[in-house]
């Protein structure tokens, strides 16, 4: 995948490219990240990228000319990139959107700044994306979130395919709790079921915890999640306030 980022702060992304999964993906040739400095496409000596808002109003807007020129440059060196822009009023980014973007061969991400961009820029855009209902100084942080989520879904990026399949949201539910050594720390013990060696029971415990965590923190996700008959029964127990250990003692889970 090739990603082109139109921004006035190209250096913002250097650290992101140099560490972790993203760096491994770049070194493996699985992704190429190109930062396009918007100021390189201005026509005045001050490299002006913004201007006042017609009709009055606070703040400044990114001008259309540099963005269109930068986009034309990208189109000349690419095939048919899918173009998104980070906007607070865009569609809220989620795992399903990340999956769809991961299927694209080329992405262009336009980072907004100040009060946004001239509305005519939207004629270049396939999709407007927001990462949440809050205000950021610009589109760069949102772009990092989107890229990180998308890149890790590219084939071959993660060394263990299972690690991405069981992550939060992969099945519409939040992830289950995880523990490592020691088995007891400051009086807090790892759940006995995880030490039992009973893999079937461990899978049931994990499913129970996923449902419980989702019910507690993101109940809205349950409306869209594909729940089995067993899931619905577990959810009923969770709503009743029962713990997994209670269900084992009562003989409802074995």
Swiss-Prot record:
GO cellular component: cytosol
Subunit details: Homodimer.
Protein name: tRNA (guanine-N(1)-)-methyltransferase
Species in which this protein is naturally found: Sulfurihydrogenibium sp. (strain YO3AOP1)
Membership in a protein family: Belongs to the RNA methyltransferase TrmD family.
Phylogenetic placement of the source organism: Bacteria, Pseudomonadati, Aquificota, Aquificia, Aquificales
Enzyme category, top tier: transferase
PANTHER family xrefs: TRNA (GUANINE-N(1)-)-METHYLTRANSFERASE
A single GO molecular function term of this UniProt record: tRNA (guanine(37)-N1)-methyltransferase activity
Catalytic activity annotation: guanosine(37) in tRNA + S-adenosyl-L-methionine = N(1)-methylguanosine(37) in tRNA + S-adenosyl-L-homocysteine + H(+)
